[in-house]
């Protein structure tokens, strides 16, 4: 049995998006165990000022992500709304049935980092849910029941 690689992601992370696209392009998605994290919480835990709130870091991150996208031929647009609060969408990922997770995941990432959409906007979210054939009211109810403990931080082993 082949061991899966844990892939920690947050929809607001351009690096998560770019890494995910490399995984998709190499047809290796089944080798990865996708785990939702809250990147802002990770920064806070480490006492790190996120690049989004440091002008120099932000400039370097934008340039770095653009270079990575160009090198790997990945459609990528820096989102005008960066950063957003991704808690709602990340909880949604945990709530959604496994057979719809991949589609939800891809649509959220593409909307934000490929199509420059505001994925914190209710209409954008409803559009994503419709494409995934997920009832909006069930989604709303479900994410309220999702525990924060399911949003993980990587641990050293």
Annotated model-derived regions:
Residues 126-148:
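Strongly charged, low-complexity linkers/loops
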Residues 12, 38, 154:
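Anionic group-transfer/hydrolysis microenvironments
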Residues 17-115:
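Structural alpha/beta surface segment adjacent to cysteine/selenocysteine redox centers
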Residues 77-79, 105, 120-121, 137-141:
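Short, hydrophobic secondary-structure boundary micro-motifs
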Residues 3-19:
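Local sequence-structure signature of Cys/Sec-based thiol-disulfide redox active-site neighborhoods
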Residues 149-155:
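Conserved small/polar residues in nucleotide/adenosyl-binding loops
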Residues 113-114, 118-123:
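Histidine/lysine/aspartate-rich catalytic loop segments that bind and position anionic ligands
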């Amino acid at each position: 049995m082949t061991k899966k690689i844990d892939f920690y992601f947050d929809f607001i992370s351009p690096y998560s998006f770019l890494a995910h696209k490399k995984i998709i392009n190499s047809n290796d998605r089944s080798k990865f165990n996708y785990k939702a994290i809250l990147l802002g919480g990770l920064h806070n835990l480490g006492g790190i000022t996120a690049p989004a709130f440091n002008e120099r870091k932000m400039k370097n991150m934008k340039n770095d992500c653009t270079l990575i996208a160009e090198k790997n031929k990945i459609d990528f647009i820096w989102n005008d709304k960066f950063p957003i609060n991704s808690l709602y969408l990340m909880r949604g990922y945990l709530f959604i049935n496994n057979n719809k997770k991949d589609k939800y995941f891809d649509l959220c990432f593409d909307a934000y980092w490929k199509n420059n959409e505001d994925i914190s906007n209710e209409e954008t979210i409803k559009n994503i849910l419709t494409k995934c054939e997920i009832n909006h009211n069930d989604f709303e109810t479900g994410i309220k029941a999702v525990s924060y403990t399911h949003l993980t931080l990587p641990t050293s082993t």
